[in-house]
Every structure is written in structure tokens, then in C-alpha cells.
Amino acid sequence: VASGGPKRRIQLTGFRGREKKALVELLFKLDCVFLDSKKYKNCTHLIAKKLCKSEKFLAACAAGKWILTKEYIINSAESGRWLDETTYEWGYKIEKDTHYSPQTQSAPKRWRKELMQSSAPGAFHRWKVILAVKEGGKRMMSVIRVLQAGKATICSSQNMGSDITHIFLHNKFFLLQNEKHFPEDQCYPLQYIEDYLLE
């Protein structure tokens, strides 16, 4: 059986309605914990309907988790046991006729292998981050979960140490208001997080 070790913790992203319901029914036939949440919940395997930039997709990439196609669930359920993940991983085959670059398509596989080989705890483990953005919005909480999944250290802008590596800004206007505090070469738009993972 391919399913040695601890139970798989499965999340889904991009599935709705009937399709999601059918996959969840199959999951109940398999030995796993299904985490039904819109937020990333430290799953071991993310099943994605398509390549996307959802919080769960980015967080799973940053944490080096398996990101797989739905066939992984369907075929495993048919076999009555978990199959080997390799051929079901997003990035296993690079598609030609898609608007996603080969680099983006291979991102899940690339990060999983890189983090496994380097034993790094996450894609952002060397980052010390300040979020110079409006507090508490939904998007903000989502960005924080992605950064935490990749093991970034998030610092408050009050204690601006010299070892800060990245300052993320909502927009340039914020920078103008706070120009004295932030060294320009450490300032990045939020978009950079996505690009760093997928490009």
C-alpha cells in the first residue's frame, strides 16, 4: 500500500457543487482526513481543479505540499487505496496550449522537490517580513496564511530591525506617506509573493 505513515490531510481548491460533492464522497471511501475550508489548513495534499492563484494553491506551493489533479482521488478510490502521487502532480506534464508558462505549470513540483532536497521548512523561510498594508482585510489575512505556510517571519513595523528582508506594500501611496521608514530596495508589491512562487 502506498499509504504508509500518517493519514493524508486533504484539501480541495476550485471545485464547486456536484463535482465537489462527488469528490468528497470518494474521499470518505479512502483513509484520510478531509479539511473542508476556504482557508489553507496545513494539508498534506491539495487537490486542485486547475492551476490557479488561490490562497490554498499558493500556500501549498510555499509549504512544498503535493498539489494534485482530481484523477488522483478518482483513481485511488477505484483502486481502493491511495496510489503513488507522482503522475498526478500538477507540473508532471507541461501543457503546450495554455496561457500558463511552463515555469508556472511546474511550480508545485518544483517547490516540493526543492524543499524536500534542501530540507528547508518553507519557500520563505529566510524572509523577515513587514506588511505595510491596511490591517485586517480578508485579502490581508489570506496573504499572511500564505507567508506563514512558507515559514516567513512576520514582524511588526514598530520594530523595524536591520535584518528585515521584505516590506510589502499595498500601493505606492503608502510608501510616500511613510517614506522615511522604509528603504526602497526592500519594498515590494504584494504581487511579488505570487510571482516568487509561480514564475
Regions found by a protein language model. Give the residues of each.
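BRCT (BRCA1 C-terminal) phosphopeptide-binding modules in DNA damage response/checkpoint, repair
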Residues: 2-4, 38, 51-128, 132, ...
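The feature marks the first
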Residues: 6, 11-49
